[in-house]
Curated annotation (Swiss-Prot):
The keyword Signal does not apply. The lineage of its organism: Bacteria, Pseudomonadati, Pseudomonadota, Betaproteobacteria, Burkholderiales. Heterotrimer of A, B and C subunits. This is Glutamyl-tRNA(Gln) amidotransferase subunit A. Pfam families: Amidase (PF01425). Keywords: ATP-binding, Ligase, Nucleotide-binding, Protein biosynthesis.
Length: 512
């Protein structure tokens, strides 16, 4: 990337907000600079849809609100949205030819809320087709390249979001996490990302993959930046049947996560030189087995040692069904995907084949032409496990395993530990094309993230150093239900004494 966007001169989102409020820079200047940077970084293939007129109109509205004293907390902050969120104005494809050219008549709730907070969108970010993938190689519009090494994958499915943040094209981005699709690309691109508790952020307007698993979450350089997006994103939404009205007795509303974050930070301040004194970090033995690469293990161990230096206590815990999360997830998620994607038939919307003899052939050809190989693979698996004679043997059994996995986490939290930490992925980013002939290799790489998703727990990834080839390593921090605020505060304490989150591709050691 040859152009450094203007927003990188001001630090994080809080500092950028102060600069905008103090008229040191305008929202239009930030937007114009970010648009230029995105164009200059076209080789990364992070953006699918950019409309400068729409972006600059939002920036002008932010400037007007700042001048009038009515600006929201994100007024003028340049962000971008994963192409799994429907947006009015920008096309929504979910990385698929099936939705090529689709124009949504409405915005997803997450998009609405961030726009109401004043954020300025640069457009839509590349992702694996229908969010199915761990490398962002399944997009119908080409793979995203990792800013740390253009030969490497960025992770998926929110690879465009992670790469755009790593390259500092935007101050933050939205993503979705079904089985690790925020955490894993955040780890492989050296940025921070969080998947909140299932039901705390609206799914309305997210192109559905696995409805009992999908959850929206932000990606940004730091934990503090994540807070600035996650808090206004969250809250009950009557348009989402899975949205929670309360979180452990407290209203599910903007302000909940920030209040918990502030309380956790106050407790850290009161603890003095060891701000995390009393925090019990559970380290699952199953996360450090033979499948974990030595370079990743070393980086994670160093991060854990840093947390101990901050006063935390490391305790051994067991999550005995960690490996069972893989087959359970790859039964449940494809089953839900096959149901959700049944609506794409070439009749109501989506790709329609140009030539067909009858209705059945039209539907068959439209789906064959519109869906990519990985999506077809998961539809076939899902249809099979839901079919008569196999439902009990596969889908019902997978749901039972899912319940047992959730119980494993609760046993760990019931008296043993406060948070769980470990790796996000077993290796650093692979090269593009490495797993082309073995698609299940990407599935196995999700071993540390899938259980969290099946249990519906909050978890985040933060930068924790570099492994082989100078490729980033992420540390996963897993909390109990509704612990987002505390997770963000714990991560911030680590980031106050380390600088991994400030490292920028090509500019190591510099901040944003």
């Amino acid at each position: 990337m040859t152009t450094s966007p203007l927003h990188t001169r001001f630090g994080g989102i809080a500092e950028l907000r102060a600069a905008l409020a103090g008229r040191q820079v305008s929202a239009r200047e930030l937007a114009r600079s970010a648009l230029d940077a995105a164009q200059a970084a076209g080789d990364l293939n992070t953006f699918l849809h950019i409309d400068p007129d729409l972006t600059l109109a939002q920036a002008d509205a932010a400037d007007a609100a700042l001048a009038a004293g009515t600006a929201g907390p994100l007024a003028g902050v340049p962000i971008a949205h994963k192409d799994a969120f429907v947006t009015r104005g920008w096309r929504t494809t979910a990385g698929s030819k099936m939705l090529e050219g689709y124009a949504s008549p409405f915005d997803a709730t997450v998009v609405q809320r961030l726009q109401a907070a004043g954020a300025v969108s640069l457009g839509k970010l590349n992702c694996d087709e229908f969010a199915m993938g761990s490398a962002n190689e399944n997009s119908a519009y080409g793979p995203v390249r990792n800013p740390w090494d253009p030969n490497a994958v960025p992770g998926g499915s929110s690879g465009g979001s992670a790469a755009a943040v790593a390259a500092r094209l935007v101050a933050a981005a939205t993503g979705t996490d079904t089985g690790g699709s925020v955490r894993q690309p955040a780890a492989l691109c050296g940025v921070s990302g969080i998947k909140p508790t299932y039901g705390t952020v609206s799914r309305y307007g997210i192109v559905a993959f696995g409805s009992s698993l999908d959850q929206a979450g932000p990606l940004a350089p730091s934990s503090r930046d994540l807070l600035e997006l996650l808090d206004p994103m969250s809250g009950f939404d009557p348009q989402d049947a899975t949205s929670l009205e309360t979180c452990d007795g407290a209203p599910n509303a903007p302000g909940r996560i920030r209040a918990a974050y502030d309380a956790a930070q106050a407790a850290c301040d009161a603890a003095g030189s060891q701000p995390l004194k009393g925090l019990r970090i559970g380290v699952p033995q199953e996360y450090f087995g033979a499948g974990l690469a030595p370079d990743v293990a070393a980086a994670v161990e160093a991060a854990l040692a840093q947390f101990e230096a901050l006063g935390a206590q490391r305790v051994a815990v067991s999550l005995p069904r960690t490996e069972l999360a893989i087959p359970a997830y790859y039964v449940i998620a494809p089953a839900e995907a096959s149901s959700n994607l049944a609506r794409y038939d070439g009749v109501r919307y989506g790709h329609r084949a140009a030539e067909y003899a009858d209705l059945n052939q039209m539907i068959a050809r439209s789906r064959a032409e519109g869906f990519g190989d990985e999506v077809k693979r998961r539809i076939l698996i899902g249809t099979y496990v839901l079919s008569h004679g196999y439902y009990d043997a596969y889908y019902l059994q997978a749901q039972r395993v899912r319940r047992l996995i959730a119980q494993d986490f609760q046993r760990a939290y019931a008296g043993q530990c406060d948070v769980i930490m470990g790796p996000v992925a077993p290796t650093v980013a692979k090269n593009i094309g490495d797993n082309r002939d073995d698609p299940t290799a990407d599935w196995l790489a999700d071993v540390y993230t899938l259980g969290v998703s099946l249990a519906g727990l909050p978890a985040m990834s933060i930068p924790a150093g570099f492994g082989n080839g100078g490729r980033p390593v992420g540390l996963q921090i897993i909390g109990n239900y509704f612990d987002e605020g505390r997770l963000l505060a714990i991560a911030d304490r680590y980031q106050q004494v380390t600088d991994w989150h400030r490292r920028v591709p090509g500019q190591q050691g510099t901040e944003q």
